[in-house]
């Protein structure tokens, strides 16, 4: 792609802005996890088993920081980073992620 920054040669499409944010969160978290573990190192048996119960170490306690007045979407991950309207968030479980 002629307009892509150097070293970025792939495109990921999404159906909406929320989906794009959810995808970006996932890519960022997986990139961090791969760099921490080692790119060619597979998950341990404990990580594989514990992730099915949403427990560490397979489901680590990572966080996404957002802005206090930002709107990032209405799906669970994106809604956890949105902080614009109470009507979007009330009665919906959310990740305990920080805001700046």
What are these regions (language model features)?
Residues 1-100:
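PLP-dependent aspartate aminotransferase-fold enzymes
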